[in-house]
From Swiss-Prot:
Skewed-composition ranges (Low complexity): 47-65, 117-131, 142-161, 565-597, 875-893
Function comment: Cell surface-associated protein implicated in virulence. Promotes bacterial attachment exclusively to the gamma-chain of human fibrinogen. Induces formation of bacterial clumps.
Coiled coil: none
UniProt name for this protein: Clumping factor A
Gene label: clfA
Organism field: Staphylococcus aureus (strain MW2)
Organism phylogeny: Bacteria, Bacillati, Bacillota, Bacilli, Bacillales
Amino acid sequence: MNMKKKEKHAIRKKSIGVASVLVGTLIGFGLLSSKEADASENSVTQSDSASNESKSNDSSSVSAAPKTDDTNVSDTKTSSNTNNGETSVAQNPAQQETTQSALTNATTEETPVTGEATTATNQANTPATTQSSNTNAEELVNQTSNETTSNDTNTVSSVNSPQNSTNAENVSTTQDTSTEATPSNNESAPQSTDASNKDVVNQAVNTSAPRMRAFSLSAVAADAPAAGKDITNQLTNVTVGIDSGDTVYPHQAGYVKLNYGFSVPNSAVKGDTFKITVPKELNLNGVTSTAKVPPIMAGDQVLANGVIDSDGNVIYTFTDYVDTKENVTANITMPAYIDPENVTKTGNVTLTTGIGSTTANKTVLVDYEKYGKFYNLSIKGTIDQIDKTNNTYRQTIYVNPSGDNVIAPVLTGNLKPNTDSNALIDQQNTSIKVYKVDNAADLSESYFVNPENFEDVTNSVNITFPNPNQYKVEFNTPDDQITTPYIVVVNGHIDPNSKGDLALRSTLYGYDSRFVWRSMSWDNEVAFNNGSGSGDGIDKPVVPEQPDEPGEIEPIPEDSDSDPGSDSGSDSNSDSGSDSGSDSTSDSGSDSASDSDSASDSDSASDSDSASDSDSASDSDSASDSDSASDSDSASDSDSASDSDSDNDSDSDSDSDSDSDSDSDSDSDSDSDSDSDSDSDSDSDSDSDSDSDSDSDSDSDSDSDSDSDSDSDSDSDSDSDSDSDSDSDSDSDSDSDSDSDSDSDSDSNSDSDSDSDSDSDSDSDSDSDSDSDSDSDSDSDSDSASDSDSDSDSDSDSDSDSDSDSDSDSDSDSDSDSDSDSDSESDSDSESDSDSDSDSDSDSDSDSDSASDSDSGSDSDSSSDSDSESDSNSDSESGSNNNVVPPNSPKNGTNASNKNEAKDSKEPLPDTGSEDEANTSLIWGLLASIGSLLLFRRKKENKDKK
């Protein structure tokens, strides 16, 4: 970074200047020779100029030769970041502090170095150069006291006070000798504060150079005039506005917003001030004990700091930001509250505010609302002061403001039930004062109380703390009744460690004219306005449930968050509503709060349309033991469009006893596109008793790619009684790759009546590798009526090892009407070991039309041991037209035989006699016997192995 430092010096046009230079030169030579003498100056300006040299242990000092021409250096504002356009300055609502630091004019090519406005800020190593003028006597000479070193820091403290007082500066020094300087008539004395800004700057100056001397500014600061001037009437483009409703409810957190805008003249310098007039009907603190106004921020830099004077107006003081900027504009928004001391009654109030000659006014209705009343009991309270520094609050309660006759009155105060109130109510933290009001008309509706106007009867009442966080006031009168109002002022403490808000409940007990014991309560809370940190109270009348027994006071449990409403009820003739809103573009350093009543009635209706596209990856280990009894009537009409990619790895151990009685009427249109990769280990033990009536009308279009690796161990006892009426149109395109190891032990008792009408169009490519071990006991009673039209195109590649041990007892009546059109290509490699005991009683009536086109290649090793007892009645009607061409006969009849006679005569002719047919039968019989023996032997070996 290219650091640029500029020093500007002004030449005083006085004859004494040359003499001063000569005297200073001689004294300088003397100091260089002895290094013991201190420089002596009668001019504050020369001392200040010397003290503004930058001294840092990490960098060398930069000095500049004084200019010899008559150019007025104060006319030029040096800042590398200043452009000719208008600079808009907006208030920063988050900045609450109002102190300012020392001025620095050192700039770089990237950002100007300006003073920051923070509380108790320590700054070090800040090089500064002087800027003075030979004609303007109002220049800030105190800029010259901004020298810092790497070893010392500046401590900035803020004193906010409404009085116009000026505090002197104390400058510490590391030398033992200090001289008090007196300003000349032609020079401005150093001044870091003005009459409106109460900032006190304590600076530590390290004077290690031999020609630098330390001096005190206490006398100078005490006698110096104000550094800045009032430029209120020089501001341009001034706008003023009052933002509020036509009615303001002070006890419902009601407030008004004051808006201001203006342009700052380019001639403004640090220390200049302007004033905003605030109407006496408003204050800027609400219920907080102190008030602050927001600083005007330019980004992270402070443009002006504000204080409140003794008249309640706001005085802003410009910082050194305006020294390096032009065309500066600013906007201010402040929340303001109805002042209870100046506006004590409900009525119309005209508010007037402004800057200089530009003003705005608005007439609003101030409505304090009325107290709560129940029969002859009346009460109202407000929290009218909060001190967050000392953690204290003040609550003012009107008891019997209606002036009715209340017999045996008792007032209790405690934390509001069901809230996290931070109030501390006990004898050590709570002080109570009671005042008697002779005339109800003397009560102010704003709850402003001047104790001097009322009779203090605190010593005449009985004040106790019977329960934790509860006080009790008994009004001891000669006739044990009251007919005039009373004011109870509670000064309490807040728990600083609590995160809750201040919330209190006051309850008045007493007998009515019919000697019925009744009670009436009033709640007080505090609400803070957005952005400003100030607020107003929320007041709401509450009529609790009435006590059951005469003289009974509701107990307060140890837990202050519980609701002691067992003896409380609500019946009120008062209606309380709240219109509260906050819109703030300003941030105020003030801590302001107010006391308000709030009642809310809300009806909410929500209409939501939702569409979901989900990618899900799930890894789940689930163990479930569930006993479920469900009786459900469900009517569902659902249109669902789902696009889901799911990767599911699930280990599930489920033991479920389910008794389900379900009537379901479902009309579903589903369009599903699913890619599923599933790896599942399942161990299921299920006892299921299901009685289901299902009426399903389903149109399904499914495109599924499935890769499944499944190990299944299933032990299932199933008793199913199912009536199913299914009308299904299915279009399925399935590619399946299945590797399955299955061990199944199933006892099935099935009674099924099935009426099925199915149109199926199936295109299937199947690659199956199956190892099957099956032990099945089947008892089947089946009545089947089947009407099937089948069109099958099948390519089958089968490699099968089969070991079958079957005992079959079959009684079958079959009536089959079959039209079959089969086109089959079969490549079979089969090894068969069969041991079969067959007892067959078959009545067969077959009417078969068969058209077969078969290409068969068979490699068969067969070993058969068969005991067969057959009783067969066969009625076969077959029409066959076969044209068989022997292997050695010519394709073209006799003509071909004549042409190839010589060739054919060399080949032996086939035997056609009866003797050859007998020989052929004998050969085949021997082969069959041998094969049977081999098969029987192999079967026996297999049984021995088992």
